[in-house]
């Protein structure tokens, strides 16, 4: 099935509002296995909308119009669609009752004749009730093409799509199932290069890479009639990806840290800390509390996070973390020594299972002979202390700070997984 989205509204063309409905609808239709081929925006003009409908009816099986269902003169979507299909507009009984109820409870509101337009649908259409507004939607099939009209405000469109439109479209359609693999430690260009054969030869399932700040995701998608069928197909493809080696010989399996569109390294660490009953603290210099704030984002953070330190100056590192000032001056704040002592000091002072520390050069200027993006990350547990050095080149100050926290979370994640393997 080929689908097309038509956004109706001059305010979209003039840039007054962003057409977020297109993204939402495209994603929802993709989940149903319905392919969206065209996005169109047209102003509040009957002749231009008629022209767009004529074109759409010749190239698409499903045409969804968004916006223009309100009471004003420039809300002309239903009227124009009715004219295009050679049909009349009729009143939907349920939508009319909703109008009656709305104005009955608001005696100060004047019910002008144009308000009645919101309760109209194209003759022969199945109404799509508006759960959060007054303008009724509708769905109708004429000469093999299905037309849908939806309200423009996202607060009205989304509930109508989720609770009214999707059930109407799901009959006799396969569903698109997706699985998102999340990677840390490999760039998009290298990842695409090493799985090039899988991407070039893809049919079903498909692979779509997405680069995010500091990490990469792969969305694996397949059309199937059930979750079980989809899992079988996606499992095969995932195993092929996991068995691939990076250019320096690492297994991609070791670089996958989790699944899901909304997952994150921070959440994986939070989950593992709770799972193993461990606690963590942090001492931060260049990241200024960003690591700690990320942990605190999750409900129940107090179970795993005892508190932390933000120590920008050398003097505060010495005073708050118990590091001899002379040693800090000797080694410098941007060093393995300082990262390790910060991690150890924070862990001891809070009696936590893990201490993590970040110190380095956020930029744009160099510091102590180290280029911008040079970061040392220390990690301490009850038995040992160690640190890593990373260089995050060609990034803004905010990106350096954010990516530094990703490295820190990954370091903690690896430590927790090693502890699990030793049990």
Curated annotation (Swiss-Prot):
Superkingdom to which the source organism belongs: Bacteria
InterPro entries in alphabetical order: CinA, CinA-like_C, CinA_C, CinA_KH, Competence-induced_CinA, MoaB/Mog-like_dom_sf, MoaB/Mog_dom
SUPFAM superfamilies, alphabetized: CinA-like, Molybdenum cofactor biosynthesis proteins
Family: Belongs to the CinA family.
Stored NCBIfam families: cinA_nterm (TIGR00200), molyb_syn (TIGR00177), PncC_domain (TIGR00199), PRK00549.1 (NF001813)
Protein name per the record: Putative competence-damage inducible protein
Organism: Streptococcus thermophilus (strain ATCC BAA-491 / LMD-9)
Gene: cinA
